């Protein structure tokens, strides 16, 4: 194999005139264009793939979808695994990613399987990922398995990004409003207070209350700030290290009227898609449940999935075990029952995952459209109330003249 092989990203149109895009390995742009033309694809744009699998430093919160997609593309093109690592290392990755690829290449060259090599890097690849790669290695379908993994991870990442994006703007609005209110209370209102000190008349009750609040905050602001930081750190450590507290918090969050339902449906989508991918790859259902439980992302759901596994070990069908768990809604149970009876369990789970992802997407759009004006209204009332409180004595004084 020519060592000059590179990975190229392309955009073009297929025989039906539809816009398509993807990645392909080749020795040169002309080689890639010719290969795509043989597939009926007319290339409009072609460039070397770069930084396609960049991951942030907080690696544990991101899925290696880009890694899977690039590696699958190279393997499908006939590039040997060791050389594929070299090609990916030349595709614009940073120092940490280059070091990871070098270690993977070294481990595989020493005789380890890819799954075993990946398992040495749990901060990058979780148990579910490694197990599915192992299935692909054993069945001789590693490239196809990596493509399926990439699809699953891309869906999961897209849902996570949508959840995060929906919360960013309302959170920024809230923080901005609170910041403006803090400036008014700590900087502006004390100046009005010195102005009102020369008034002989008593201040309105609302104005006096705001001044007292400003005085109290100014006097105790450092203590309140330090206390808030310490409380946040303590709560975070309690959640991370104390299992009963983690379960209690998760139950309270899932019980919230709107956000709880959103997070619950997102967890169901993750469960259904992960289980569908594992089962479709040929992993036995009991083993697949054990792996999916570890990758479920939540203590409450992890316990529920382990109980499903226990129920199946005792002779129950998956749908029967799910029916006994309140975390799994009747629709999901019914789809699983249909899948088990018809031998299409992986397809029914994929349908369930798509359904819950669509539900989350629609609910997020509706929530965002309602939440943003509500926050603006509340913040307007808050800031406007502080301003009115300061001008009430002036209006009162003007009416007496």
Curated annotation (Swiss-Prot):
The compartments listed are: Cell inner membrane
Instruction: List the GO biological process terms.
Output: protein secretion by the type II secretion system
Membrane-related topology note: Multi-pass membrane protein
Its signal peptide is none
Major location, coarse class?
membrane
Q: Which UniProt keywords apply?
A: Cell inner membrane, Cell membrane, Fimbrium biogenesis, Membrane, Protein transport, Transmembrane, Transmembrane helix, Transport
GO terms for CC?
plasma membrane
Does the record's keyword annotation contain Mitochondrion? no
Is Protein transport one of the keywords? yes
What InterPro entries does the annotation carry? GspF/PilC, T2SS_GspF/T4SS_PilC_CS, T2SS_GspF_dom, T2SS_GspF_sf
Q: Membrane-crossing residues?
A: 166-186, 215-235, 375-395
Its job: Involved in the translocation of the type IV pilin (PilA).
User: Which family does this protein fall into?
Assistant: Belongs to the GSP F family.
Q: What is this protein called?
A: Type 4 fimbrial assembly protein PilC
Species name: Pseudomonas putida
User: Which lineage ranks, top first, belong to the organism behind this chain?
Assistant: Bacteria, Pseudomonadati, Pseudomonadota, Gammaproteobacteria, Pseudomonadales
């Amino acid at each position: 194999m020519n060592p000059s092989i590179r990975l190229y990203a392309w955009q073009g149109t297929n025989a039906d005139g539809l816009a398509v895009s993807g990645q392909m390995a080749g020795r040169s742009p002309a080689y890639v264009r010719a290969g795509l033309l043989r597939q009926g694809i007319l290339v409009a744009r072609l460039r070397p793939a770069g930084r396609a699998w960049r991951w942030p430093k907080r690696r544990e919160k991101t899925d290696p979808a880009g890694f899977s997609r690039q590696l699958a593309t190279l393997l499908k093109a006939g590039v040997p695994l060791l050389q594929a690592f070299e090609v990916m290392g030349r595709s614009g990755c940073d120092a940490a990613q280059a070091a990871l690829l070098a270690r993977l290449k070294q481990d595989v060259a020493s005789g380890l399987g890819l799954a075993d090599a990946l398992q040495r890097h749990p901060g990058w690849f979780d148990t579910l990922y490694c197990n599915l790669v192992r299935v692909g290695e054993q069945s001789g379908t590693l490239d196809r398995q990596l493509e399926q993994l990439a699809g699953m991870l891309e869906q999961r990442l897209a849902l996570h990004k949508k959840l995060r994006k929906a919360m960013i703007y309302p959170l920024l609005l809230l923080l901005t409003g609170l910041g403006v209110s803090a400036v008014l209370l700590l900087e502006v209102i004390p100046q009005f207070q010195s102005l009102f000190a020369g008034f002989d008349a008593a201040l309105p009750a609302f104005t006096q209350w705001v001044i007292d609040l400003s005085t109290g905050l100014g006097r105790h602001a450092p203590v309140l700030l330090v206390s808030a930081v310490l409380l946040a750190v303590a709560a975070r450590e309690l959640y991370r290290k104390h299992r009963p507290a983690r379960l209690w918090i998760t139950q309270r969050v899932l019980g919230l009227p709107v956000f709880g339902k959103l997070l619950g449906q997102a967890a169901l989508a993750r469960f259904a898609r992960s289980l569908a991918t594992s089962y479709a790859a040929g992993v036995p259902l009991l083993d697949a449940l054990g792996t999916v439980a570890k990758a479920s992302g939540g203590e409450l759901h992890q316990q529920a999935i382990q109980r499903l596994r226990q129920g199946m070990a005792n002779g129950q069908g998956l749908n029967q075990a799910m029916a006994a768990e309140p975390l799994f809604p009747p629709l999901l149970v019914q789809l699983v029952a249909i899948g088990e009876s018809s031998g299409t369990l992986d397809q029914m789970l994929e349908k369930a995952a798509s359904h819950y992802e669509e539900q989350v997407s629609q609910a997020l759009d509706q929530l965002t459209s309602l939440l943003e004006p509500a926050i603006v209204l509340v913040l307007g009332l808050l800031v406007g109330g502080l301003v009115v409180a300061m001008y009430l004595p002036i209006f009162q004084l003007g009416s007496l003249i």
